[in-house]
């Protein structure tokens, strides 16, 4: 067998199947495009669902890809095994109703055994099949010539994830020899068993049945092939190394970790786990961020945050106690660059995000210790065991390692209820597994639409009307020849001016009619074979297939949609100009009355940034730039600087919407002929929609004017209420009122201080000596959170050499503040005091050594927290 680099295996695989007539499908972004059923792209076939379920027809029925993927259903196993990963590449060849078992098996055998390709020894290959799949057996045995002893029948060789395509599969195994798997159970020592000797290198799925809702199976009209070969695993076989982590995909990362930590890989098993966790997770994190995901507290962002925190935790076992993961990004970029240049292009941004997250997590670890200390106190007072649910919450919510929880508990003479902890973990795994199974199921093929292949030409770029012929009617899921008045119907036209919903732009509406009937068109979508599929209600008459009709788009709405779509392009370019090149479109909606644009960015825009973007767009509108639209090949388009939307798939010929030099973008939508037609652009809101995604909503033309007119009316009302005559006086009047309010609040604050002082009496008498320190620990009665700080300032001026800790209950919320004289901060730190107290009142806090503050939601525990902090100081 040849010893090949991973990049060579990938290229050979693609080249082989191109020779066999396959079309290369580029690797899609990890963040799914137009697929809400998936959190991540999690397999090679995930991006091809649209072809398998019949929604779209590919240019070629034979497809090959190398697809990056993320799976996080068993994160806790990564690092402890030889081949578990959260990020991996899946090589796959697919047939959509073209070749089937015979060719799929022959292709696989040729690629693996031919000296031109992988050059594997035929006598080291074994296969598994489903017991009832005699067709696969005969191909392997009679055509390939594989001995019967090397064909293993396994009941589990049937690919079925619920409703949708399913079928038997055959897996190919490579025998690595007796040196591997010596510690594995004898009963598992066979291809398909749990062992290290026989490694699965390829899985061929023969998708020939539909799994129906009633759990019956019916033959698919078009049989499909779906195969998967893990690149990391194949690299480990080709390079003859024990685990995936010793391949050239990982070893440069391991070498860098060795430099940073001073530890060696493959010397200590416990440390090796940390090496593998870090190496795996940094690949996932770097690629996910490069594809538009950002750390957050939910969804994809939560997965990233969890992975990063897990890697940081394990790095501490290597003695790394400072941010360093971000330094590995360049290594990942160099390894993957030949096929995935995106990580290198965005490396600076990725490093910035990761470093910020690392710094935050080092602070989180401190918070976790404070919570754990409370759990230890609670356990000592009750069962001498830390509750498993509490330990799981500490692990799952705060990212605190269960191993560290156990270690600290043992040192305190306690144990952790691991049975309950493991139960909680298993429930989480089950939820993730179920979600994965649900998300991977495909739709049942739509045969009615799929079988309609007659052409339907879109002519709406140049006109809003057309004389055309009605070619197909679909009613209640069946193709019919006529439909009566009042019914909802789907139909196709030989030529149509109606734009189908696509690229964020809504569909046109309008009417299709002749002397005998009229249909009000409400929706237009793309059929599987690319035709525009119209939906409408028959207003009067009887609709017949073959009728000659007039098709008219609602031109008022069309003009407004054009304005908003062209403005969206200008907005995208302006955002990149103001915020940076990391901005990518994450979604858009172009309607007649407004536009909405989602984009990747890691924080809210400032008012100044919003103003800059708005000004840039309007300047381009007022310049009156001609909008030139051309069709050209994709290479020429990119050479002229056309921006391709992130994650969008394009054909060989593309449509370029050119508003040069400001915006040049690939787009199939409808646009104005000159930017001056947009008239006016106004941003009305900027908000967050999720992890690292911001949303701008904006208006153009008449809608923008009416919006500003409404604001002007409200401004005039405010001017009247303030009793000023000119616009310029409004700000002065508001400033005057604010100054008067501040003066009144200051008077109230002083009065509150005086009242508090009277209530407290002589505070010097309340100072205690604890462990050699002068300490004032007390609850104060104040009207608001701000007042506790002013009270502290007052006390500090009188007790300059005293540690002061104050707590208050304001509206059932706890506020607390601590100060420590600077001369004492080497021994006592205000931040530590608050961190110890805050969890007791159900909150958190921190700050500097000399000043800190915090809060909580359990005012009933204020007395308990004050007593605790006295004991804490006593034991310093």
Curated annotation (Swiss-Prot):
Cross-referenced InterPro entries: aa-tRNA-synth_II/BPL/LPL, Ala-tRNA-lgiase_IIc, Ala-tRNA-ligase_IIc_anticod-bd, Ala-tRNA-synth_IIc_core, Ala-tRNA-synth_IIc_N, Ala-tRNA_ligase, Ala_tRNA_ligase_euk/bac, DHHA1_dom
Per its record, how is this protein called by name? Alanine--tRNA ligase
What is the UniProt remark on how the cofactor binds and its stoichiometry? Binds 1 zinc ion per subunit.
Entry comment, domain topic: Consists of three domains; the N-terminal catalytic domain, the editing domain and the C-terminal C-Ala domain. The editing domain removes incorrectly charged amino acids, while the C-Ala domain, along with tRNA(Ala), serves as a bridge to cooperatively bring together the editing and aminoacylation centers thus stimulating deacylation of misacylated tRNAs.
Please tell me the species this chain comes from.
Answer: Staphylococcus aureus (strain MRSA252)
Could you list this entry's UniProt keywords, alphabetically sorted.
Aminoacyl-tRNA synthetase, ATP-binding, Cytoplasm, Ligase, Metal-binding, Nucleotide-binding, Protein biosynthesis, RNA-binding, tRNA-binding, Zinc
Instruction: Give the matching NCBIfam families.
Output: alaS (TIGR00344)
Q: Which PANTHER family match?
A: ALANINE--TRNA LIGASE, CYTOPLASMIC (PTHR11777:SF9), ALANYL-TRNA SYNTHETASE (PTHR11777)
Annotated GO molecular function terms are: alanine-tRNA ligase activity; aminoacyl-tRNA deacylase activity; ATP binding; catalytic activity, acting on a protein; transferase activity; tRNA binding; zinc ion binding
